[in-house]
């Protein structure tokens, strides 16, 4: 991903380089994994990068770990990220961490949502809340129309689009979706961004490559525009007080993510007197770099 290493050299706000796959990089002396004096049973809710990092670190410290994932695979959104052009290494990173989880003998339960009933049944000593985030669907007139889809579903192959495509959101996910559509043979989509620039959530290395892709692929980007309506064949936006129309066969939302609802977990743990540790996107939707470091640090301190 280059965000912890290459971007670490360029970003003066970062005290040292780090690594999504190894959060101890740059601070090895303070991140020694030592056996716990009090091994406990820990239920980890969510098998994305944060959940796997927490589970792996907890297991290495001697805790008994039960890792539950609501879907049929480990890796979470990192698997999706690795399905876009030029990012296969990210999918490999998620798959390799999944292999480490299995090799450590962690009790992995796929297709298993962590509910209050499951917590009462397993009676863990603690629960790590790593349920992640889900895409934001804005409340825009027309957002529920059948030609309106979500970027994650395109990347995951659940939805196929064709013809003219307008992508709402010019951050990393929106632009990588545009890149994926161009690579699959579609007409370069139009990307609409509310802010004054695209790629603002990308690290410097990835941003440089994406800006080159935008130019080479002739992806049209319109900034400082607010989408106000979606119709059967049109996305309507407002820019500088003027209404602009963008003909489309499909409109795609890529406007970011928000933490998944953890209300049931919090209530169940509070009722049973069980420690609840919330990390990663379940705490706040961010990059995987922050999610894995937060999970690692929490598991180390547990």
Mark where each language-model region is:
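Active-site/binding-pocket entry motifs
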Residues: 4-7, 11, 24-28, 133-135, ...
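Rossmann-like dinucleotide-binding cores of NAD(P)H-dependent redox enzymes
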Residues: 64-104, 179-225, 283-285
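Generic secondary-structure signature for well-ordered alpha-helical cores
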Residues: 3-10, 24, 102-106, 219-220, ...
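Short, hinge-like loop/turn segments at secondary-structure boundaries
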Residues: 83-87, 127, 145-146, 207-210, ...
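Membrane-interfacial segments at transmembrane helix termini in multi-pass membrane proteins
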Residues: 21-25, 31, 74, 80, ...
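Rossmann-like dinucleotide/flavin-binding elements
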Residues: 36-70, 74, 109-123, 130-147, ...
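Cysteine-cluster motifs in flexible loop/terminal segments that predominantly coordinate metals
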Residues: 1-39
């Amino acid at each position: 991903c280059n965000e912890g290493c290459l971007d670490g050299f360029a970003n003066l706000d970062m005290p040292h380089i780090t690594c999504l796959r190894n959060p101890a990089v740059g601070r090895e002396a303070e991140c020694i994994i030592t056996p716990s004096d009090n091994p406990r049973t820990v239920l980890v809710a969510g098998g994305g990068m944060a959940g796997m990092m927490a589970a792996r670190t907890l297991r290495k410290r001697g805790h008994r770990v039960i890792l539950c994932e609501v879907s049929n695979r480990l890796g979470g959104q990192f698997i999706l990220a690795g399905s876009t052009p030029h990012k296969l290494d990210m999918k490999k990173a998620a798959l390799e961490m999944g292999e480490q989880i299995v090799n450590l003998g962690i009790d992995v339960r796929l297709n298993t949502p962590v509910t209050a009933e499951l917590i009462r049944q397993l009676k863990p000593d603690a629960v790590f809340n790593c349920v992640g985030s889900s895409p934001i669907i804005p409340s825009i007139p027309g957002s529920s129309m059948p030609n309106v889809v979500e970027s994650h579903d395109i990347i995951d192959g659940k939805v196929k689009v064709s013809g003219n495509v307008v992508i709402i959101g010019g951050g990393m996910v929106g632009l990588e979706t545009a890149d994926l559509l161009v690579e699959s043979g579609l007409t370069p989509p139009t990307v609409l961004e509310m802010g004054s620039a695209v790629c603002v959530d990308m690290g410097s290395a990835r941003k440089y490559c994406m800006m080159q892709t935008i130019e080479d692929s002739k992806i049209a980007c319109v900034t400082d525009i607010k989408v106000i309506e979606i119709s059967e064949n049109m996305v309507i936006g407002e820019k500088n007080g003027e209404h602009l129309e963008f003909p489309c066969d499909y409109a795609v939302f890529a406007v970011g993510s928000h933490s998944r609802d953890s209300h049931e977990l919090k209530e169940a743990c509070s009722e049973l007197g069980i420690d609840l540790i919330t990390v990663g996107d379940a705490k706040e939707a961010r990059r995987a770099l922050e999610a894995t470091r937060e999970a690692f640090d929490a598991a180390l301190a547990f």
